[in-house]
Amino acid sequence: MPIMPSTTYHKYDVTDYEAIDPAYGTMDDFTTLVDECHKRGINVIIDFVMNHTSSQHEWFQTAYQYLQGLPKGAEPDALECPYVDYYNFSKEKLGGYYPVEGTDWYYEGQFWSEMPDLNWDNEMLKTEFEQIVQFWLDFGVDGFRLDAVKEFYSGADDKNIAVLTWFNDMVKSKKEDAYLVGEAWNDYSVYAKYYQSGMDSFFDFTFADKDGIIADTVKGINGASAYGKSLVNTQELYGSYSDTYIDAPFYTNHDMARSAGYYSGDYSEAQTKLGNAMNLLMSGSAFLYYGEELGMKGSGKDENKRAPMYWSTDAED
């Protein structure tokens, strides 16, 4: 999850892209973390939210207040307020749009009213993010995990791929060996085409979650041969879009129930271990959600799925 300042516990509503949320420490702490990781041969990637900001971000607040100050019927002028073009404002109340109080304007916020969507048609916004990327690379970051890449333009894969192509090329021009992984939550037949962007990896959602291919195989719903065929089919499809792709298999994440709760009965612990082993043995760069190695449980509300790491045997107390 993101480490930047935010109004929420999950930090996906960023208020400042060039700082650390005080709950996690300081920039000095982060520098120490990166340095110590690098000494041990560990690379550091950070969660990067490009689909939306917080409604409390300076960009949005400036644009929102500018629209509130416009005379009725007047059109916004980006020369007067560049930030008004950083977001998607409309006089039509479309799906996922919310009112700008005191005006006849609406803004897009597909995930939540407090997370307004960014407008990736805007070149100045791209310049802003190029500077933000450089900021984190200067601190030694080795790559980025891009959140919700399928929603930059909801339902328009080609436009999403174009943004990712720009981002990949921009980052690699600054750090050739940077690692980029994207979250495009869908079936593999959809996110496979996103490899056209040149991005290194995309999370392999087809194998994840309580009803994914791994869990269904462990439960005996699918046989071993079907599991093997799924591996071959996905790898062949990804390879048809990119000859440099690195699969990003995972078993569960912060939006899913934890895997220790997928199974019941006398063999549940063994099944949990088997599922995680299958994930780690897939080709590519496997991701392990913190706490999975301990058998942490959590389901239902998002807060339960994102409980703090158990650092000691009495953590539950």
Description of each model-found segment:
Residues 1-317:
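Active-site and adjacent substrate-binding regions of carbohydrate-active enzymes
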